[in-house]
Regions:
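Charged, flexible cofactor/metal-binding loops and thiol motifs
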Residues: 103-118, 122, 133, 147-301, ...
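Glycine-rich cofactor/substrate-binding loops
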Residues: 1-26, 64-70, 269-388
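A general structural motif at alpha-helix termini
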Residues: 48-52, 248, 259-262, 349, ...
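A helix-coil-helix interface module used to build multimeric assemblies
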Residues: 1-192, 197-200, 263-266, 276-280, ...
């Protein structure tokens, strides 16, 4: 992610150092399973301990090897073997293929990211709840359908709907965390040619994961749970931001984002107070939707494996998490200092008071015994004449 929209907690998960540490975590879980289960591998527990005591990551050396091999996982495995001063290092990556390490690590990093996203969602929900508790939440504000005056409601009703949308998204994030419970250590083509089912299951258990039926890679539709959960949050945040933008339009002006002292809205028009924060949220939401489309396209791979998805995934997995956390944080800052112009909202509601009571007028006639069509027609005519 470019520095402007980077979120540090997400960066810490997806940065190269942590990615390689996660790869190492997967490799060590596999070695542990090889050494402690009855297999034809002669890796002893003592040799395993030698590996664990000496194995280390040297990023510079990894990059040096990769420049020659042009294969990041092969370079990683070679670097690890070089760090172990013993022949036992030959068992590193035994029976595995690169996708075993990459895809299982992806699952772990996605789960970590969702935990951070959960926290940011909770923070935003906190500020939304504070709005409901405010004295101004009971004030009247006009509801609008199709952009036209509908009925009078309260600010609390607006805020409650915002909360409901974000809570649905929050639930989707939690559900995605529970669904991301499978990994893959079944080797080339997913056939368990060298690494048996028992070894795979035991290694994955160490990582709090389960084995899955798949080819050489974890099917990309499996990761759609991650992207879909983020999409739900993005859509909920975008809706709130978009509503605030509408409420801040001149002539409406019932709510607006904070405008700080010394802030400028335009280089040419000094009077301008543009809703740049909520507009920024909507812009980043558009970007995320393009990532969601890419994630869907990545689900199609050639037979047992290809890497057509790889280049895009190096961007969309981490940047998706950056985007959603950034816009959640930005929305929290907007909500914390949201301008609620209750007097203007009251005036706007009063202007349309006759029209917004049309349902009550129609219902009164229905209660008097008139047909619904007659009641609707008469009420509509009276409203148009403003004759009540």
């Amino acid at each position: 992610m470019i520095p402007r929209y980077k979120v540090q907690e997400i960066h810490d998960i997806w940065k190269t150092e942590n990615k390689l540490n996660t790869w190492l975590k997967v490799e060590l879980a596999h070695l542990e399973s090889l050494a402690r289960n009855m297999t034809d591998v002669t890796l002893s527990v003592d040799e395993l301990n030698i590996i664990k005591e000496n194995i280390s990551i040297d990023i510079d050396r990894w990059k040096e090897i990769e420049s020659e091999t042009r294969h990041d996982v092969q370079a990683f495995v070679q670097m690890l073997e070089e760090s172990v001063p013993h022949t036992s290092g030959r068992w590193i990556h035994y029976g595995l293929t690169s996708s075993d390490v990459i895809d299982t690590s992806l699952v772990l990093m996605c789960k970590e990211s969702l935990t951070i996203i959960e926290r940011y969602c909770a923070d935003t929900l906190f500020y939304l709840t504070n709005l409901i508790k405010s004295d101004k939440s009971s004030n009247k504000i006009l509801s609008r359908t199709h952009g036209k005056a509908a009925e009078v409601q309260t600010y609390r009703q607006v805020f409650t709907r915002w909360i409901a949308g974000l809570r649905r998204a929050f639930d989707a994030v939690r559900l995605a965390k529970t669904s991301l419970k499978y990994g893959k250590l079944s080797g080339p083509s997913g056939n368990h040619t060298t690494n048996c089912l028992m070894n795979e299951a035991n290694a994955l258990r160490t990582l709090s994961l389960y084995p899955m039926t798949c080819s050489q890679i974890i099917p990309r539709d499996y990761f759609l749970d991650y992207f879909y959960a983020i999409l739900k949050v993005v859509l909920a945040v975008e809706k709130i931001a978009y509503d605030i933008r509408i409420y801040s339009i001149d002539g409406v002006n019932e709510m607006s984002e904070p405008f700080k002292k010394g802030q400028k809205g335009s280089s040419a028009m000094p009077h301008k107070k543009n809703p740049i924060l909520t507009e920024n949220i909507c812009g980043l939401s558009r970007l995320y939707k393009s990532y969601m489309h890419t994630a869907i396209e990545n689900c199609l791979t050639l037979l047992e494996r290809d890497i057509s998805h790889s280049a895009a995934e190096r961007i969309i997995f981490k940047d998706s998490a950056h985007i959603v956390c950034f816009i959640l944080k930005r929305l929290s800052n907007v909500l914390k200092d949201l301008n609620i112009n209750e007097d203007i909202a009251e005036q706007n509601a009063a202007i349309f008071e006759n029209m917004t009571s049309s349902q009550d007028i129609m219902n009164d006639r229905i209660k008097e015994g008139f047909s619904r069509k007659f009641s609707h027609d008469v009420s509509q005519n009276e409203i148009e004449k403003n004759n009540f």
